Design a protein with these regions (language model features):
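Bacterial N-terminal signal peptides
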Residues: 4-16
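Secondary-structure end/capping motifs
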Residues: 220-301
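Pocket-lining segment of extracytoplasmic ligand-binding domains
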Residues: 85, 158, 165-255
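Short, glycine-/small- and polar/acidic-enriched structural segments
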Residues: 21-163, 167-173, 177-183, 196-200, ...
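Ligand-binding clefts/hinges and TM-proximal coupling segments of bilobed small-molecule sensing domains
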Residues: 134-152, 231-263, 305-308, 314-321
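Conserved C-terminal helix/tail region of periplasmic/extracytoplasmic solute-binding proteins
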Residues: 293-329
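Short linear loop/turn motifs
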Residues: 57, 157-159, 265-271, 303-314
Length: 329
């Protein structure tokens, strides 16, 4: 049954590696192919995983819910994801999922508006496109509107439009006045003449958007595998942050785009917000718990520290390994 699920739901982004030793591949599940996640691709491309004793293959899943499901089933040991409400609800109810690193500690969204809206005052009464209610784009839209001094429940109309392409089409057609846009689609929005009114990452929004998550069981049984993976990953992050030209080429491969400007937009944005030391985001998880508590007050008894394990990044940091990566550059 498990093998059938894997065969039907995943495809391998890289051909299975031929182990240099007898080590079996470590499968990392990706909830999506999107901006920020390319740091994992860079890590593999520069050989950092193999240098740290890890034979890593990437598997694409059909969203965050499936990634969490397969992680908890034991079919894969690590995922890029696990930061949203579903994951934290599962953890609170006794599931073994746990965040060991956060490498996008904010929501990578901006609010773009048409040319008639030059400032926050003119945003009042506007229609703003998101994917769906309760989504990260919804959360980001409400946060940005609030930071602009407006009440998202009264001063604007937030509309469920769909994915990024559908939201951009709605903005172009004039059926909405603004939209939540992620990088590198921010470049396309500007090229179409739309104005960036707010950037959530610059307004102080803390959120565990992209994470490395595993299970308590895997940490107990194979702590060296988790440590080796994260040691390689911080090496990949260091390369990404300090080698723009090479990283842009890898972004083009990963996102499957030919436009250098699109890849550069992604690089400029995510290299700015990707931390050198990807500690699990305690503040971000705390925000998710507060979001859940609105409808599930019982979760107020939980502490954010129960949902993360920062021991691996702490060890890498305190040993001087991470700082040493940047001294070499």
């Amino acid at each position: 049954m498990k093998g059938a699920v894997l065969a039907l739901c995943f495809f391998v982004l890289f051909p299975p590696s031929l182990p240099a030793q007898t080590q079996k591949p470590l499968l990392l599940g990706l909830a999506s192919i999107s901006g920020g996640i390319e740091t994992l691709y860079v890590t593999k491309k520069i050989g950092a995983f193999k240098r740290n004793g890890q034979d890593v293959d990437f598997l694409l899943l059909q969203g965050g819910s499936q990634a969490l499901q397969v992680l908890l089933s034991g079919e894969i040991k690590l995922i890029s994801g696990g930061g949203g409400t579903a994951a934290q609800r599962a953890r609170f109810k006794g599931a073994g999922n746990v965040i060991v690193a956060t490498y996008t500690p904010t929501m990578p969204y901006s609010l773009y508006v048409n040319g008639k809206i030059q400032d926050a005052k003119k945003l009042k009464g506007a229609k703003i496109a998101i994917s769906r209610f309760g989504s990260s784009s919804d959360f980001a839209a409400r946060f940005m509107v609030s930071r602009l001094g407006l009440d998202p429940a009264k001063d604007v109309t937030i509309m469920q439009i769909g994915n990024q392409r559908e939201r951009m089409s709605a903005l172009l057609s004039g059926s909405v006045d603004g939209s939540v846009v992620d990088a590198p689609n921010t470049l396309i929005a500007r090229q179409q003449g739309f104005l960036e009114l707010a950037d959530a990452s610059k307004l102080g929004l803390t959120y565990p958007h992209n994470n490395i998550a595993t299970t308590d069981r895997f940490i107990r049984e194979e702590p060296q595998a988790v440590f080796g993976f994260l040691r390689a990953f911080v090496e990949g992050i260091a390369f990404y942050r300090t080698h723009k030209t090479e990283s842009i080429q890898m972004i083009k491969e990963f996102l499957r785009v030919s436009d250098n400007a699109i890849a550069e937009e992604a690089y400029d944005y995510y290299s700015r917000i990707t931390p050198a030391k990807p500690y699990p985001s305690t503040d971000g998880v705390r925000g998710v718990l507060e979001e859940i508590a609105v409808s599930e007050p019982a979760i107020k008894t939980a502490k954010a520290e129960q949902f993360i394990d920062g021991t691996f990044i702490t060890k890498l940091d305190q040993s001087g390994f991470i700082d040493g990566l940047y001294k070499k550059k």
